[in-house]
């Protein structure tokens, strides 16, 4: 069946910001699908609110709209673009929910838009828990006993029948949001209440518990002709009860018999038919009773999912690409397999290796959060590893996580930790076998399949054997590497340096070989160079070429501070080097990303980003240089070791990296260079820290070196706060000094992305943070161009940056953070790499910043590179292109405004206080573009938490009370209902605002929390008292969140707001911006414009000059 010719234009909905449960895998899927549709000649329109994505690059599609993912904005885009079809299966749960809403509201019918890939009734049947259960029963498949409820009372009735524990699953949600396992009435009430809020349908399924059963997933494909294949079987290492996103998973399934697998395969096919699935990829989850073999179907996702990305990378079968082609009418047997070039997509992949996916957690970023894992996902990222055996793949996965510090385990309560899994689950399992627990004992506590536990026991037993051997024992060393032990682990066992192990290995000839991922277990010759290492093989399948080569190091697992933005930069760097004729080798361990798509680079090595693994690849490939500038902190950390081993690091040598990453050295360098820095001191002990803080004067900012995302940074106001921080952080030592800076209160922070070619300097993006100093730039909203800087100040900033870049002799990208106070510019820090704001800046100015930065690294000159994009808008609206006298090339200054807003997953971590500080906690971002700041900010907020236009609650500290009066007064005049606590209400009332007083918690009923839960509050303005809390205090408050003392009153309001999805503003600056957005919304309807239209209009205006 040929492609459909009645369709010309297809609208693709993205998944929005990166958050827990919906991450970079949807950019990978979207980018693949867009490329596939374009290859068939279709026009493609994309709408997404997330600028940090390859799929929103204007070169990729015919029209890209970075707009809020709401029905109103989608309808506006549809009205303007008039697409023939809408493809909703590539944007996660967000896109599916929007597609259903567009259908129900008649928008698709009104504009004659066809839903392709999946039909509305199919989505309803798959996503509505009750409909799904009925459909499965009707086709003879067993499901878990369950009831759909819409109130706590109904849930209590169901539990009387089922008994505890029960699993609560909200409808139409992702990542298990709002769900959980209830073991008693108190937990039931709390989870059901939260689940009803999280569910768009306001229903939850109460399910009879099968905690401890084995969990499996099948990734399947189906076309219009009912051809069906299984792409990959995936087995969860952890049993039912832990969200699959938080579980270690293994592909292919290891403990299924062939009979069980065929039974599961047939069930999957029946399930697709039962819900009327049209064409594309689908993920189906099963549970199997370990003792009886009973099989039940848990749920299905009628779309490309997180597991689809994993299955694609695990097998080499591009699920998203083929899903898009099936959606427009092709059959599986009409789509060629691009890896073999001999088979078609109708051939089921066959793999002769084992893949392990391991989640990456960052619980330390959310003090006070529930640590126990359950049905609500908590991991922020993941890694994938490939080995010839489970043991080897497991070892590679563990080192891919890049965990710098071994967790402190509570071995005295080890059994309790095994029975109640946390993010440290795997460490406790290793510890259990080190402490001689048997497989049966660990199985009884964890319900993990004995096959997996036996494999781990064998690894731990062999570790004991190694401790009795010498490192030069060939047999032991060879077996250790086959079992997945890293050189670093062996060095710790033998009490020698890692370099010593490497030398012994090479001398004894114990080195890895590289095998190809080919979809067919070598049955056909593969054309695509996609490799993994193994010590369980003889033949090397990678053949190095004689071309000029560059090796690009990826960013590893997504984590807070190092997310999709760095993969975006890496992909652009790869394309830039390829354009200049280089063969590009990509090394990365993250299955969610575009960079690990096999057709992005010339060669892909799916390997851990460690010194050991990079050196082994370099030994074979012999690259001309290694690029560490685009992968965040991960590549920078190993640059020294790579350089020491003779590899050439392009653009940044270790000495320069160490100077900029070492807080004390860099601060001293700035001072010696005559550049302004806040007063500071270096402390190597608690005594020195206390003395330094007293000399500088409180408040002070405390910063360790070599951290990303503000890890372990804090602002402290008093001596007791400082002592609390140091004892809690355990970071200070002679080898790990802390920098104590004077905290610049009320300073304006600037984020600057800059590129240098060694001669000229180009400020690509000058961004102003909306919140004042003290909040990490990754968590603060920012605007480009700045809105409050004078011309003189801008000139001063440009001159300062030029001096700094030239004095450090930087070539390539850098990110500089500045603070402006009383018209004085202070340098806060410099990062010798591309920053997380690169994608945002690229979309804001219409120039691919990462590409330009990459080309300067290989000797290209900025003046020539930027000429291609001239004229671009500058502050002076220049018509002639030439460097300024200072050597600073014209800084882009768009005629429109762009705002970046952070997305923080507080809803996933109940009990966490939402107050922001110098340690980053956001996982993603959204972007708003408008003619003025107010419009851009309004769009950014609509993309994030939304904007309320009905009522607000105000409770602020004494210092902020006068500042809020005109802001609240304006909203009151617009018709907002204003609630306030006593002190704030008194000030507002004295200024003529009719305020409704509310009780604080513990002062009377109904109190402020009651009003929030009753839905009477649209948004909240609550500012922190001048006495800031340290992370230790926030942690203690969270653990004691039911106390009624005054200290926890604000905490209770903020946590209630998160639970009830009420936007909560915690700074005056953000409130001021929110009011400007509300004013703009009241004034007129917000427009929608594609990036192509924006850039074309701006360039046209300039050319007319």
Curated annotation (Swiss-Prot):
CC annotations in GO: cytoplasm
Residues given in the record as Mg(2+) 2 binding sites: 299, 301
Names of the cofactor(s): Mg(2+); Mn(2+)
Region (Carboxyphosphate synthetic domain): 1-402
Residues that, per the record, bind ATP 1: 129, 169, 175-176, 208, 210, 215, 241-243, 285, 299
SUPFAM superfamilies: Carbamoyl phosphate synthetase, large subunit connection domain (SSF48108), Glutathione synthetase ATP-binding domain-like (SSF56059), Methylglyoxal synthase-like (SSF52335), PreATP-grasp domain (SSF52440)
Binding residues for ATP 2: 703, 742, 744, 749, 774-777, 817, 829
Cofactor descriptive note: Binds 4 Mg(2+) or Mn(2+) ions per subunit.
Enzyme class: ligase
Domain spans labelled ATP-grasp: 133-328, 667-858
Binding site for Mg(2+) 1: 285, 299
Binding annotation for Mn(2+) 3: 817, 829
Region annotation (Allosteric domain) ranges: 946-1105
Keywords: Amino-acid biosynthesis, Arginine biosynthesis, ATP-binding, Ligase, Magnesium, Manganese, Metal-binding, Nucleotide-binding, Pyrimidine biosynthesis, Repeat
Assembly, per entry: Composed of two chains; the small (or glutamine) chain promotes the hydrolysis of glutamine to ammonia, which is used by the large (or ammonia) chain to synthesize carbamoyl phosphate. Tetramer of heterodimers (alpha,beta)4.
Protein name, per record: Carbamoyl phosphate synthase large chain
Organism listed in the record: Pseudothermotoga lettingae (strain ATCC BAA-301 / DSM 14385 / NBRC 107922 / TMO)
Originating gene: carB
């Amino acid at each position: 069946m040929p492609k459909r010719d009645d369709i010309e234009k297809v609208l693709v909905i993205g998944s929005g910001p990166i958050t827990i449960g919906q991450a970079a895998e949807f950019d990978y899927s979207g980018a693949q699908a867009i490329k596939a549709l374009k290859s068939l000649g279709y026009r493609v329109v994309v709408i997404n609110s997330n600028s940090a994505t390859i799929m929103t690059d204007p070169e990729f599609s015919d029209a890209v709209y970075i707009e809020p993912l709401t029905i109103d904005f989608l309808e506006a885009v549809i009205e303007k673009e008039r697409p023939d079809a809408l493809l909703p299966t590539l944007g996660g749960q967000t896109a599916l929910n929007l597609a259903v809403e567009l259908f129900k509201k008649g928008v698709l019918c009104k504009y004659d838009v066809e839903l392709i890939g999946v039909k509305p009734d199919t989505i309803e049947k798959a996503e509505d828990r009750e409909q799904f259960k009925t459909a499965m029963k009707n086709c003879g498949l067993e499901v878990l006993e369950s009831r759909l409820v819409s109130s706590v009372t109904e849930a209590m009735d169901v539990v009387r029948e089922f008994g505890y524990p029960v699993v609560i699953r909200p409808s139409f949600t992702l990542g298990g949001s709002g769900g959980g396992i209830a073991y008693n009435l108190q937990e039931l009430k709390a989870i059901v209440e939260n689940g009803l809020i999280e569910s768009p349908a306001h229903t939850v399924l109460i399910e009879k518990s099968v905690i401890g059963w084995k969990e499996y997933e099948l990734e399947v494909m189906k076309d219009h002709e009912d051809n069906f294949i299984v792409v990959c079987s995936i087995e969860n290492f952890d049993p039912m009860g832990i969200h699959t996103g938080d579980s270690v998973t293994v592909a292919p399934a290891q403990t299924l018999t062939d009979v069980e697998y065929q039974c599961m395969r047939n069930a999957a096919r029946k399930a697709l038919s039962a819900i009327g699935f049209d064409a594309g990829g689908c993920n189906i989850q099963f549970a199997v009773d370990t003792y009886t073999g009973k099989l039940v179907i848990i749920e299905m996702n009628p779309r490309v999912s997180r597991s689809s990305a994993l299955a694609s990378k695990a097998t080499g079968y591009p699920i998203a690409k083929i899903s898009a082609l099936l959606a427009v009418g092709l059959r599986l047997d009409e789509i060629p397999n691009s890896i073999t070039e001999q088979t078609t997509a109708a051939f089921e992949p066959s793999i002769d290796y084992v893949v392990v996916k391991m989640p990456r957690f960052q619980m330390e970023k959310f003090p006070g959060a529930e640590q126990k894992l359950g049905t609500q996902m908590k991991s922020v990222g993941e890694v994938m590893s490939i080995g010839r055996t489970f043991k080897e793949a497991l070892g590679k996965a563990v080192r891919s996580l890049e965990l710098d510090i071994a967790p402190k385990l509570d071995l005295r309560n080890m059994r309790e930790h095994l029975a109640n899994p946390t993010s440290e689950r795997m460490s406790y399992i290793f510890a259990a076998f080190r402490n001689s627990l048997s497989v049966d004992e660990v199985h009884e506590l964890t319900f993990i399949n004995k096959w997996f536990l036996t494999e781990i026991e064998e690894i731990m037993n062999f570790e004991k054997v190694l401790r009795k051997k010498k490192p030069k024992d060939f047999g032991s060393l060879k077996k250790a590497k086959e079992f997945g032990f890293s050189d670093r682990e062996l060095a710790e066992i033998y009490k020698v340096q890692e370099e010593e192990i490497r030398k012994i290995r090479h001398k004894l000839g114990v080195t890895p070989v590289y095998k190809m991922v080919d979809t067919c277990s070598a049955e056909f010759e593969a054309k695509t160079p996609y490799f993994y290492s193994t010590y369980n093989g003889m033949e090397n399948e990678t053949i190095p070429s004689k071309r000029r080569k560059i090796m690009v190091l990826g960013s590893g697992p997504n984590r807070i501070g190092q997310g999709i933005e760095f993969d975006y930069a890496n992909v652009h760097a790869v394309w830039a080097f390829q354009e200049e004729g280089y063969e590009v080798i990509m090394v990365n361990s993250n299955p969610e990303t575009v960079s690990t798509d096999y057709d992005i680079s010339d060669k892909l090595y799916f390997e851990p980003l460690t010194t050991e693994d990079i050196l082994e690849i370099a030994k074979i490939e012999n690259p001309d240089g290694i690029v560490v500038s685009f992968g965040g902190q991960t590549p920078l950390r190993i640059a020294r070791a790579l350089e020491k081993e003779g590899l050439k690091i392009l653009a940044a040598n270790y000495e320069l990296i160490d100077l900029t990453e070492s807080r004390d050295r860099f601060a001293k360098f700035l001072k010696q260079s005559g550049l302004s820095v806040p007063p500071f001191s270096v402390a190597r002990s608690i005594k020195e820290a206390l003395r330094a803080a007293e000399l500088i004067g409180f408040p002070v900012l405390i910063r360790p070196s070599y951290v990303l995302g503000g890890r372990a940074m804090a602002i402290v106001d008093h001596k007791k706060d400082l002592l609390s921080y140091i004892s809690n952080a355990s970071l200070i030592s002679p080898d790990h000094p802390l920098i104590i800076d004077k905290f610049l209160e009320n300073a304006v922070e600037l984020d600057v992305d800059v590129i240098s070619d060694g001669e000229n300097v180009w400020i690509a993006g000058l961004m102003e943070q909306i919140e004042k100093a003290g909040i990490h730039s990754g968590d603060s909203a920012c605007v480009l161009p700045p809105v409050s800087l004078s011309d003189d100040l801008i000139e001063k900033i440009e001159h300062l940056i030029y001096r700094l870049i030239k004095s450090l002799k930087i070539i390539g990208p850098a990110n500089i953070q500045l603070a402006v106070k009383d018209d004085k510019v202070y340098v806060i820090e410099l990062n010798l790499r591309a920053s997380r704001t690169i994608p945002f800046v690229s979309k804001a100015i219409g120039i691919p910043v990462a590409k330009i930065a990459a080309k300067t690294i290989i000797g290209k000159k900025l003046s020539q590179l930027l000429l291609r994009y001239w004229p671009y808008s500058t502050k002076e609206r220049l018509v002639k292109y030439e460097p300024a006298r200072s050597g600073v090339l014209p800084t882009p200054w768009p005629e429109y405004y762009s705002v970046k807003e952070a997305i923080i997953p507080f809803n996933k971590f109940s009990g966490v206080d939402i107050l922001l500080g110098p340690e980053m906690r956001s996982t993603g971002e959204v972007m708003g573009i408008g003619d003025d700041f107010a419009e851009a900010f309004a769009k950014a907020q609509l993309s994030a938490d939304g904007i309320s236009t009905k009522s607000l609650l105000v409770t602020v500290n004494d210092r902020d009370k006068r500042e809020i009066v005109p802001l609240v007064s304006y909203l009151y005049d617009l018709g907002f209902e204003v609630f306030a606590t006593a002190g704030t209400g008194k000030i507002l009332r004295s200024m003529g605002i009719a305020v409704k007083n509310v009780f604080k918690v513990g002062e009377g009923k109904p109190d402020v929390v009651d009003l929030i839960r009753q839905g009477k509050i649209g948004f909240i303005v609550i500012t922190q008292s001048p006495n800031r809390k340290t992370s230790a205090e926030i942690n203690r408050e969270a653990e004691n969140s039911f106390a009624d003392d005054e200290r926890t009153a604000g905490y209770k309001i903020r946590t209630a707001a998160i639970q009830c999805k009420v936007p909560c503003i915690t700074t005056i600056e953000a409130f001021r911006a929110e009011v400007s957005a509300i004013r703009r919304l009241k004034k007129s309807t917000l427009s929608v414009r594609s990036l192509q239209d924006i850039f074309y209009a701006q360039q046209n205006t300039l050319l007319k000059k």
